[in-house]
Amino acid sequence: MLFDRDGDVLCVIDLDTVMPSFVFSDFGDFMRTAANPVPEDSPEYDKIDFNMDIYHAFTEGYLSTAKEFLLPVEIENLPYAARLFAFMQSVRFLCDYINGDVYYKVSYPEHNYVRAR
């Protein structure tokens, strides 16, 4: 994130956001990460959650500008992006685990399996 001099958030930056992509990718992947109070590789499954306050605040800010270029169908379906990307990333971690951890960097043998759960 970029902050102003008072410490307020100016914008969220990510290398994925500067290349062409599907709007659900950017929105969904950000929500998957930002609205979860624990890291994606936390083994504390009981603490995994989805913070609706973060979701609503981000969505409001995002749409304040994005509504100018998004299609109505894209706006209507943004809520599904967060679900889709949580599921999709879980499948990617599981596939990498099954394939011998060849894509994602791991810190221990079961790391991608923990991420997938």
Language-model segment annotations:
Residues L15, E40-I48, Y104-P109:
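Short beta-alpha connecting loops at secondary-structure transitions
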Residues M88-R117:
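ATP/Mg2+ or Mg2+-diphosphate-binding catalytic cores
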Residues D16-M19, G28-M31, A35-N36:
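The catalytic "switch" region of P-loop NTPases
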Residues M1-S25:
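Active-site acidic catalytic loop and adjacent metal/ATP-binding pocket
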Residues M19-D26, F50-I54, N112-R115:
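Short acidic-hydrophobic sequence patches enriched in Asp/Glu that either
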Residues S25, D29-R32, H56, E60, ...:
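Feature representing long, continuous alpha-helical segments
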Residues S25, E74-L78, S107-E110:
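Composition- and surface-driven signal marking solvent-exposed, interaction-prone regions
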Residues G7, A34-A86:
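A conserved long alpha-helix in the C-terminal portion of kinase-like catalytic domains
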